[in-house]
Amino acid sequence: MIIMALNCGSSSVKYQLFDWDKKVVVAKGMVERVIVGDSYIVHEVPGRDNYKLEQDCPDHRAAIDLVIRTVTDRECGVLQSVAEISAVGHRVVHGGEKFTCSVRIDDDVLNAVKDVQHLAPLHNPPNIEGIEAARALMPAIPHVAIFDTAFHQTMPEHAFLYPVPYDWYENHGVRRYGFHGTSHLYVSKRAAMLLGKPAEQCNIITMHIGNGVSHCAIKGGVSVDTTMGLTPLEGAVMGTRSGDIDPAIPAFMMQKENLSAKEIDSVLNKKSGILGITGRYTDRRDVIEHAAKGDHRCQLALDIEAYRLKKYIGAYMAAIGKLDAVVFTAGVGEMGAAIREKAIEGLEHIGIHLDRERNAGAMTRKRESLITTDDSPVKVYVIPTDEELVFTEDVVAILNGTYTDHMQFEYSFAKPDFVRT
């Protein structure tokens, strides 16, 4: 059984083909610069040289058509025909309150996703375009939607509601939704496995740190709070996003610099965070390198990021009670030993005893690592995320009629005999 995972961004289409029977990725890749011009595909097959082809893709349909032609190409492909694909899983960033789990896509589901696209105007429209294009190009194949927000639909009202006029929530859906749900789900299940306890008996803080950053408080195996809010802008310091700031700052700066609402939104989403502080960098490797050379603003960016990480660990520990583990994941979380160290050093009083040697050695995206001492009351793990595996398992279970929701479904990666491929 071959499952295709699609992730359609504003100017890109990521894809992966997973052989469910053999439990291996058979191909993956990305079409970049969709719509904007000079588009190209990079196609990766294990054991082969990467394949790159430049081809104009004026829209997502053209990009997905290029993906299909590439994966079925006689020379660089891995399939004889698109009919070998059993189903397609689509990442959808925002499902609003309607979608609490992954669902098979029909016209009603697609219309419901369109109804909430105003909540994610940068992300849902390309997701929708990708779904429409893929359904048109592969009409005989089942399509499934996997929502970034679904994992967080277990949050209680006191965690997801903002202290603003209640009719904003009733009339416009203004509340905390949270994102990166599939990543938080995967690493929390793996952490429970490493702890040797059922997920429903674990209290875990998961820290997804890439260019986008979100943290999640998981109590008894379910999300009870998360840092991102109505949009992915709230919360931790990110590569280009500000995260938490005084809500009065946008209006203040709009007046001071005569900025429109659209312009201030762009500044907070695309010109703030690590980039805003350093003035030059979003890649933490560049920031760490130049901080070591004495660049004050790079050092300041690292200090601010680590300080905010530490604050959220403390806040979420207070919210969920006795803490079993903290998990770092995603690009920076998995590879940024220096940032991890700054975030968790000095937390011995709350039961976190960092092993600096272990932390320094956990610089790979292929291995799960414990970075605290053996006797640390709270364990800290580095766990490479695998959102595509969550996509695949949800799709297969929906096809087989065995899927209920992410809380009750027994994922293969939550079992003792799981081996990461």
Swiss-Prot record:
Which Cys residues form disulphide pairs? none
Query: Which reactions appear under catalytic activity for this entry?
Result: acetate + ATP = acetyl phosphate + ADP
Question: Where found?
Answer: Cytoplasm
Catalytic residues (positions): 148 (proton donor/acceptor)
UniProt-annotated binding residues for ATP: 14, 208-212, 283-285
Origin, by domain of life? Bacteria
Which InterPro entries does UniProt cross-reference here?
Answer: Ac/propionate_kinase, Aliphatic_acid_kin_short-chain, Aliphatic_acid_kinase_CS, ATPase_NBD
Q: How is the cofactor bound?
A: Mg(2+). Can also accept Mn(2+).
Name the residues annotated as site: Transition state stabilizer. Answer: 180, 241
Query: Per UniProt, where does Mg(2+) bind?
Result: 7, 387
Q: Which Gene3D superfamilies match?
A: 3.30.420.40
Give the main EC class: transferase
Record's GO cellular component terms: cytoplasm
Q: Which family does it belong to?
A: Belongs to the acetokinase family.
- HAMAP family in the record: Acetate_kinase
Q: How does it assemble?
A: Homodimer.
Q: What is this protein called?
A: Acetate kinase
Please state the gene responsible for encoding this protein. ackA
